[in-house]
């Protein structure tokens, strides 16, 4: 199979390319080398990929390449919370316009192959919760007064009591809480519209907290594990917001890449979203301590994470996945347990941020 991978020079995309090549597939890698992420082509790009350094918003790019490929693995996106709302036009243009341009070209060219789309757990907003009195409930955004008082867990919208967190399934209501999350959900809706109108199928992989080699070093767009690892590399304590008890599911990039390969090869093809997670949630403080302990083993430098109590209004408290559907439909189960993956991540090579960030 010949697969077109977008965002192929990026953190996750580069690992997908490697696993596709190892699986015997041909790979066309498309990447715009956005200057907010790259100074130029990274030195670790696989030479077995046919590289096209162009923008996914370029309609002519798609019309030239789609007749040559059997599947599209769409990873290209501007990621993370960004700096502030002034980033919104860039997020919408890169993520939503880029996806719309791709889908329009797929329709016009009569593309009949597979589509696998990188989505994110951020589409859910807060995770699943239960109230002792009212059962399953969906809390709204947390009250700034509670956050300022150090009450970080969300309250029941019916009685105001504190809630117990659970795992979220793919049929949970969606509630994106920031611009990035809104664009990821819009990407899903656009892909679903394409699938309905053309009789195709779009597999949307909702990644949970991805970490691993080639993560970008500390930037406003980096994941939390990159931020922690960057702090340790500087000899600084990782700063853990709130009380550190917020729960996440950390999934290794090798597993995420493998999930894409499995989705591309699945028979029958799966149409719809799937959680891609380790299935072993932990608290943010536990993850930071695991990373700091592994750093100490490697370097002899003992640095304890600091719980700083601060908060960001766009953050959710707990979001952890139920991975059952991915196992049942495409046969994906994560291989890397976070306790092992985070320990090895302490010695992983991170990519340097661009020297001249726009």
PLM-predicted stretches and their roles:
Residues 1-207:
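N-terminal Rossmann-like NAD(P)+-binding domain of SDR-like oxidoreductases, especially those catalyzing
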Residues 21, 66, 103-107, 192, ...:
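A structural alpha-helix within SAM-dependent methyltransferase catalytic domains
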Residues 54, 232-358:
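C-terminal substrate-binding subdomain of Rossmann-fold SDR/epimerase-dehydratase oxidoreductases
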Residues 77-83, 120-123, 209-215, 245, ...:
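Active-site proximal helix/loop that lines the substrate pocket
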Residues 84, 156-178, 202, 206-217, ...:
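A conserved pocket-lining segment of Rossmann-fold NAD(P)-dependent short-chain dehydrogenase/reductase
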């Amino acid at each position: 199979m010949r697969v077109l991978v977008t965002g192929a020079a990026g953190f996750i995309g580069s690992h997908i390319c490697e696993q596709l090549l190892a699986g015997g597939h041909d790979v066309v890698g498309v990447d715009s080398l956005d200057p907010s992420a790259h100074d130029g082509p990274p030195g670790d790009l696989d030479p077995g990929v046919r590289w096209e350094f162009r923008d996914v918003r370029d309609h002519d790019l798609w019309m030239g390449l789609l007749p040559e490929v059997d599947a599209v693995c769409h990873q290209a996106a501007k990621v993370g919370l960004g700096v502030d709302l002034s980033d919104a036009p860039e997020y919408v243009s890169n993520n939503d316009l880029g996806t719309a341009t791709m889908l329009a070209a797929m329709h016009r060219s009569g593309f009949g192959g597979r589509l696998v789309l990188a989505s994110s757990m951020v589409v859910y907003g807060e995770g699943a919760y239960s109230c002792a009195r009212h059962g399953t409930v969906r809390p709204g955004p947390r009250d700034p007064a509670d956050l300022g008082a150090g009450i970080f867990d969300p309250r029941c919208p019916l009685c105001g009591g504190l809630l117990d967190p659970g795992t979220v399934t793919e049929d949970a209501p969606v509630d994106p809480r920031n611009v990035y999350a809104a664009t990821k959900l819009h990407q899903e809706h656009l892909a679903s519209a394409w699938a309905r109108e053309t009789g195709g199928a779009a597999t949307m992989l909702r990644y949970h907290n991805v970490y691993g080699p080639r993560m970008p070093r500390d930037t406003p767009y980096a994941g939390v594990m990159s931020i922690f690892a960057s702090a340790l590399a500087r000899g600084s304590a990782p700063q853990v917001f709130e009380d550190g008890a917020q729960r996440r599911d950390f999934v290794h990039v090798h597993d995420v890449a493998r999930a894409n390969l499995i989705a591309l090869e699945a028979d029958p093809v799966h149409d719809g979203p799937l959680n891609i997670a380790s299935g072993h949630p932990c608290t943010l403080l536990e993850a930071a301590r695991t990373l700091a302990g592994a750093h100490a083993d490697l370097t002899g430098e003992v640095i304890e994470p600091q719980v700083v109590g601060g908060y960001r209004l766009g953050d959710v408290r707990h979001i952890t996945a139920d991975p059952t559907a991915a196992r049942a439909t495409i046969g994906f189960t994560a291989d890397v347990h976070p306790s092992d993956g985070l320990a090895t991540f302490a010695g992983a090579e991170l990519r340097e941020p661009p020297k001249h960030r726009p």
